[in-house]
Amino acid sequence: MHSVHRNMHLLALGSNATGESSSNAGLLAQAYDAIKAGLSGTLRSSRLFSTPAFPKGSGPDFVNACAVVESDLSPEAMLALCHRIEAEMGRVRTQRWGQRVIDIDLLAVGDQILPDRATVAHWMELPLEDQMRLAPEHLLLPHPRLHQRGFVLVPLVDVAPDWVHPLTGQSVRAMLEALDPAEIAEIRPI
């Protein structure tokens, strides 16, 4: 008998397509079910949170959540699963950071850095204006902006408070505590 190596995948999920929290929450539940059906592993999910659209004023509020998935999938296979689920649920990628039926982001896979430390560090340091107009051509892990986003860190602390960012050396809890309180003031559990 051989053991299967399980990776800890951190996912962020969000929806603001309907403009109604209850409908968007239902879309997140549908996405969770699809993720569970697409893998042989475990999934732990955070509470659901109402969060302002990012950038602020760009659309209706989101319902956001995070999940920890223990699976033998590679980062690329998990990303492909997330994109397939988004497409099946009707997500069309037209506007960067625009309104969406479902958004499933692969935040991190354990302590892996992809494609390399320098590339991820470069994307982490991009000014907001550049972040809004540029998109990476390949998978970046950890997600280059997760440490700056309250709408990610608030639900992520529910399921992975002690996960440590391999570039910053900070835990999720520490990254959340380092945010400006204004960044999380409007984030509310549903």
Task: State each model region's role.
Residues 1-40, 46-52:
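N-terminal beta1-alpha1 ligand-phosphate binding loop
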Residues 2, 54-61, 79, 86-190:
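Flexible, gly/pro- and Lys/Arg-enriched active-site loops
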Residues 9, 65, 149-150:
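Small-molecule pocket liners
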Residues 15, 67-73, 108-111:
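Short beta-strand-to-loop capping motifs
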Residues 16, 45, 67, 155-156:
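A residue-level signal for conserved active-site and pocket-lining positions in enzyme catalytic cores
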Residues 28, 64, 79-82:
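A general structural signal for well-ordered alpha-helical packing
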Residues 44-71:
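Short, charge-patterned binding micro-sites
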